[in-house]
Amino acid sequence: MSQETVLASIEEAIDKSLKLGRGKRFKQSVEIIVALKDIDLKSPQARIRETVFLPNRPPKEAKVCVVAHGDMELQAKEAGVEVLNRQDLQNLSQNKREVKKLARRCYWVLVRADLMGLAGRILGPALGPRGKAPVPVPPNANIKDLIERYKAAVWVRIRNQPQVMARIGTEDMSPRELAENALAVLQVIENRLGRGKISRIYVKKTMGPPVEVPAIG
């Protein structure tokens, strides 16, 4: 089946899901749910956690936070994101409540590589249960470019159920844009597990019913 045919099938389901349900007072996200089969959740190979860079950035961007020092800290502040330095991390180590708040509000935590040990020890216990993890950044990386890329990125992960759920955009995006984002998620799953591991695919709005994507295998 050609990629264009797959896109058309996904787009058809998304278009239907966007029309279902009453309008809400808030902008709803659009999600993809991928049900998997023949997956051993006890196997390390099945416990995937991958980054997907969506080709079409949602208007509701993922919140990016940066842990850095020196020039990278300054560049991140210029980019307008929340920034923590070494001293900020050390202060947080005494305040688990604030660490949990940070873990809730930051979808991505980009960490300068030489601060990964400290960030992992302090932030890891709060990020892990939320399916998140600090992302190491080389000291010479262009942090502004990375921030922009991660604003359009989502985690793809398998935890305690044989399925993947990911936000692919918002209801004000076009069905084709959302379909292209959904395809990016599917390609990452297939690259890791193989297409034969995908059982069913659904799309839905936050408060809407799931709509199954026609078979694309």
UniProtKB/Swiss-Prot annotation:
Transmembrane segments: none annotated. GO terms for cellular component: large ribosomal subunit. The keyword Iron does not apply. One of its GO terms (biological process) is translation. The keyword Ribosomal protein applies. InterPro entries: Ribosomal_uL1, Ribosomal_uL1-like, Ribosomal_uL1/biogenesis, Ribosomal_uL1_3-a/b-sand, Ribosomal_uL1_arc. Belongs to the universal ribosomal protein uL1 family. Part of the 50S ribosomal subunit. This is Large ribosomal subunit protein uL1. It comes from Aeropyrum pernix (strain ATCC 700893 / DSM 11879 / JCM 9820 / NBRC 100138 / K1).
